[in-house]
Amino acid sequence: MENLQVIQVATGMISIPPNGWGAVERIIWAYQNRLERMGHKVDIRYLNQVNYQPNTIVHTHIANLALDCKSRGIPYVFSLHDHHSEWYGKGSFVFNQNLEAIKGSIISFTHAEHLVEYFSETDKLFYLSHGVDTEFFTPEYSSPKSGQHSLLMLANNGLAGNSGFDRKGFRFGIEAAKHLDLPITVVGTDNNLKFFEAHPDLMEYEKLSIVANNPTDEETRKLYQSHTIFLHPSMLEAGHPNLTLLEAASSCLPIVGTYKGSKEIKGLHIIKDINTNEVIEGIKKTIDDYENIWNSMYKVREEYDWMHVAQKLAYFYKYVLKVNERYDSEKTKSLYVKAYSETPRYV
């Protein structure tokens, strides 16, 4: 494949590489890192710094920036990262803005398969999985003995400005830990302190540890390595799998949580209903077969690396350039399908 010229449009909210909690910024950084390893040239620029040239791919990650590209006459690729578009629903301002961004793009990506159907008003939306740095998030394994398991939850809780909204299922994880008499660590930003202020009863569990200091990547890696089960009973995500789930998978940390997708995640016990009993049963089953689960995760962990995602992304980019040659809509669609079929299926 010929070398590509790519501009990833910065969100303008958090620096890249991110110096704190910023999922979209981590994704942009990962795209640049892996695409450059493949020999492509990737710049990260603010939109007002973009001087569009033919044969350059401009990739935006925020709907209003995508629409700004459209108004400036800049052809663009768009990634949908906004879980609010599903939360507020069809017809809402957020949904309509993201739909307009998708329709105005050359091609758009969602990182949750079910959202392709959810945005049924357009045929420009394709699924592209998230990835993980498998070279960084590595396992450290010693078989835990009975009674020595420890649970980990890692998330920034809340929804739509309400820090007390339990989108990530902290209550279910903590109540399950209490029922099983297991230690649990809840990690995230200082915003999580506001969640616990709204739910003071959860802090009564003496084996609960709260880490709300926005941990560094190195601290996060050690947390994955020092716990034995990852809990992710989340009710709303823009990524399936999301970033923390893949970090846990790369670290060979068995997972009990929610997931919508056809791609199998080894070591993931999927809870169908989000409640405490489901989490308890998932933890029990994971403990009962821990050795086999860990081994199955170790065998496939490298398949989740960002490099595989970048390879698929590069194929799409290649066909984006062909679409820019003014193919008709049917030809355009066939090019998208061809790009999808030519790349590895596990991403």
Where are these regions (language model features)?
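Donor nucleotide-sugar binding/catalytic pocket of nucleotide-sugar-dependent glycosyltransferases
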Residues: 103-139, 146, 154-156
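Acidic donor-binding loop of glycosyltransferase active sites
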Residues: 225-238, 253
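Conserved catalytic-core segment of nucleotide-activated headgroup transferases in glycan assembly
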Residues: 146-200, 217
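Nucleotide-activated donor-binding/catalytic signature segment of Leloir-type glycosyltransferases, i.e.
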Residues: 196-221
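Acidic anion/phosphate-binding donor-loop and adjacent secondary structure
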Residues: 88-89, 131-148, 162, 324
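A charged, aromatic-enriched C-terminal amphipathic alpha-helix characteristic of glycosyltransferases
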Residues: 288-345
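Short hydrophobic beta-strand element within catalytic cores of glycosyltransferases
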Residues: 250, 254-257
